[in-house]
């Protein structure tokens, strides 16, 4: 069970922790994450950071239910979050650190990203909380299968802002941002019609196997995160250049620029997903949850438009639940079977009337073939 036994650095008692934390707060400077920090101060130098780019792309996703604003104040207003002292932030993060084999350290780099989440990107955090209700149960199931720290589920926040169809400037795709070649190595199908890098189940399983392989090489979860982002070669090179240091913070100066912000963003994501409501950020609901869905195997080629008409599920919901179908078409290919995820109550409807639904679809669009 990798890292299940807490290292000696984590065998400290919570009693007596407060004094150390307040001393650390004085060293860092009070209220690093208070509302007094402006967006210009916080995101200066982060404008082209992939984490912020993915966060901002979530504003254009249409997966969310209409309704009252999910934050107490206008999330677009800089400093809309309540002011929270640095010592409180540090103490909360230390409590989370006690509950995981990951090292959730706190410093000015982590504080910078916490401020981004808590003050400058509140609406995006609200949306990620909603998507988390759909994806986190799935992530936890897969991580538990491989006996990995469950907190690694928050890595998808840094990678894709939980947008299943996210695509980076260099072509990394999906919740876990697999490049084409890496996806193929881990068995993900990428074709003109199907991209399993965007399949929540398939890509999560592949990401877990990839991280376990990295853990076998580095034996440290923070180094695994760095290697997931920059590649194991860059981490090994940073270890050599640092004189053989073996922790993320020791080798950080020798890592690529993007990776120097990657682990701090991950630690900040752990914080904000556990303490969002203390910052008056609440989940913006999506139309479905992981516990309310099931899968079927189609026996006939069908478009999302057809399926939407037949089972009365909005196309947007079908896209959210089945992001692996690139053209919104579920293909039929000899020797392969493709599943469709639907709201659970619609699965029963489909199974009960399956043959008549196929006949209706054929009558409506006879001879439909792949484009």
Can you say where each PLM-predicted feature lies in the sequence?
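N-terminal secretory signal peptides that target proteins for export/translocation
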Residues: 1-17
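An acidic, Gly/Ser/Thr/Pro-rich helix-cap/linker signature
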Residues: 2, 20, 34-146
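Hydrophobic h-region of N-terminal signal peptides that target proteins for export
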Residues: 26-34
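Substrate-binding clefts and substrate-entry loops adjacent to catalytic sites
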Residues: 113-127, 162-169, 177-219, 239-253
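Short, functionally critical alpha-helical segments immediately adjacent to catalytic or ligand/cofactor-binding
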Residues: 148-165, 224-231, 319-322
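Extracellular LysM carbohydrate-binding repeats and other cell-envelope/extracellular binding modules
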Residues: 255, 321-357
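Primarily a LysM-type cell-wall glycan-binding module
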Residues: 284-312, 364-371
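LysM (lysin motif) carbohydrate-binding repeats in extracellular/periplasmic proteins that recognize
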Residues: 303-332, 371
């Amino acid at each position: 069970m990798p890292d299940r036994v807490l290292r000696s650095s984590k065998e400290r008692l919570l009693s007596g922790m407060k004094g150390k934390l307040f001393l650390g707060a004085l060293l860092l400077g009070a209220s690093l994450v208070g509302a007094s920090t402006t967006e210009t101060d916080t995101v200066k130098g982060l404008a082209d950071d992939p984490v912020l780019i993915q966060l901002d792309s979530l504003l254009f996703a249409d997966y969310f239910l209409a309704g009252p604003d999910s934050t107490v104040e206008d999330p677009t207003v800089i400093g809309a979050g309540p002011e929270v002292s640095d010592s409180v932030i540090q103490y909360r993060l230390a409590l989370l650190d006690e509950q995981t084999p990951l090292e959730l350290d706190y410093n000015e780099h982590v504080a910078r990203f916490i401020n981004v989440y808590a003050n400058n990107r509140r609406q995006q955090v609200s949306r990620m909380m909603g998507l988390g209700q759909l994806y986190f149960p799935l992530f936890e199931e897969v991580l538990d299968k491989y006996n990995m720290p469950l907190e690694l589920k928050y890595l998808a926040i840094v990678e894709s802002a939980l947008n299943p169809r996210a695509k980076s400037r260099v072509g990394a795709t999906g919740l876990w941002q697999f490049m084409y070649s890496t996806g193929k190595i881990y068995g993900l199908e990428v074709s003109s019609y199907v991209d399993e890098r965007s399949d929540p189940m398939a890509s999560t399983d592949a990401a877990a196997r990839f991280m376990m392989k990295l853990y076998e090489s580095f034996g440290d979860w923070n180094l695994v995160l760095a290697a997931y982002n920059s590649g194991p070669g860059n981490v090994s090179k940073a270890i050599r250049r640092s004189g053989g240091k073996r922790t993320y913070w020791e080798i950080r100066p020798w890592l690529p620029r993007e990776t120097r912000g990657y682990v701090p963003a991950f630690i900040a994501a752990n914080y904000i997903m556990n303490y969002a409501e203390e910052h008056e950020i609440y989940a913006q609901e999506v139309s479905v949850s992981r516990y309310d869905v099931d899968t079927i195997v189609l026996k006939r080629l069908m478009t999302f438009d057809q399926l939407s008409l037949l089972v009365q599920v909005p196309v947007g919901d079908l896209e959210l639940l089945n992001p692996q179908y690139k053209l919104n078409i579920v293909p039929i290919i000899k020797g392969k079977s493709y599943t469709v995820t639907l709201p659970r109550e619609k699965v029963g409807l489909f199974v009960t009337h399956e043959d008549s639904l196929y006949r209706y679809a054929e009558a409506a669009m006879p001879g439909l073939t792949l484009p």
